[in-house]
Amino acid sequence: VETGPSLYYEEIKKSLNDINVDIKKIKNVLVTHIHLDHSGGAWKFAKNGASIYVHPKGAPHLISPEKLISSASMIYGNDMDRLWGKVEKINSEKVISVSNNEIIKIGNFEFKALYTPGHANHHIAWQFEKNIFTGDVAGAKIGNGPVMPACPPPDIDLKKWEESLILLEKQ
């Protein structure tokens, strides 16, 4: 679940090598949303053959990331490469759109897509058994600090965010 920015790819590769896992054997990546800190490295996994699972509203931006890159560049300017690294398009055959409550089977594991808009209108939380990978919808915890709301993007919808938190609480 998640790739982080493309800058993290080599670190992920090294960590997997440390446990004798070849990064090229990863064939499925679930992303909560398309913001670069969560899926900016998805293209590298897709180049290795992985399928990338994402909300239908996010899929076009992984296939053609020009608008995403332009938007992020307006915020981060000259720091784009330093913060997020390179972003490339993903072949449409590797981008799989998923619906709310859809079950994705990967080997013997099942992940349930929970549509959780608010932080982003294409946000999905991924439920695995009793655990939920919440992306940014449930906030962020840095170190030993409290859980805080994630940095809000310009298109935040507070009402939908609250509804998403209630949905997660009921799971």
Q: Can you name each region flagged by the protein language model?
A:
Residues 5-6, 110-112, 121-171:
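Metallo-beta-lactamase
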Residues 56-58, 101, 117, 130, ...:
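Short, flexible active-site-adjacent loop segments at beta-strand->alpha-helix junctions, enriched
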Residues 39, 62, 76, 116, ...:
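Long, contiguous hydrophobic alpha-helical segments, chiefly transmembrane helices and signal peptides
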Residues 9, 18-99, 103:
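Active-site HxH/HxHxD metal-binding segment of metal-dependent hydrolases
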Residues 13, 17, 43-46, 162, ...:
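A structural alpha-helix within SAM-dependent methyltransferase catalytic domains
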Residues 98, 104-121:
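Charge-patterned, long linear interaction tracts outside catalytic cores
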Residues 1-25, 126-134:
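Conserved beta-strand hairpin/beta-sheet module of binuclear metal-dependent hydrolase folds
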Residues 1-4, 27-34, 53-55, 116-118, ...:
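Active-site neighborhood of phospho(di)ester-bond hydrolases with catalytic His/Asp-centered motifs
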